[in-house]
């Protein structure tokens, strides 16, 4: 709410008239993230133009689908916004209501990505997805845990977890499996709302994934990909130059292929 630029919610559908259940992909599209009122340190804030890497990966997938003429129905949901301080900005202590009616206490405005993803995940229910996968540069905790060469995958089924990791390995994009243990969910409970948008310091990437799980349509196989590490590089090596890497595009393309054959 602090930005002068209105938020946008982009819906892409490769075959809207198809009867089959689609593969639905959700991408975090924070076009610049200052942290809001909970302001980030100045160092490396310029890299936060890359906080839309999840949404960009899905746009890359749709470009590939268009170029190859894939017949599989794919839906992309891209919640896009800036997170900046301002007179109308969300404040720590505010309570907001998500699309599915869940109330969320905002304790840190720099945990904004999970809020826009939550609404997009809830919105996906109208498409009755065969699978639901979200991509996001979601947590610094994931970057600290796994470094810059691998993304985290949190999946509700072993099959989807295996498909993502195996297809990622085919194209040089690596994923490490992470838990969605129910006993970790307790610190997300709020005394004034259904959930808090942050929990305790330790295990931050897991808490973020467990927060998102509350918004996944019932009975849908879901995976959350935290790509905070490999989505950006400072190196000038291999096929990459400093900046965004496009991580995830090739994995998603291979994943679509496995559901098409």
Show the residue positions of the predicted features.
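A generic structural signal for tightly packed, nonpolar segments enriched in small/aliphatic residues
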Residues: 1-261
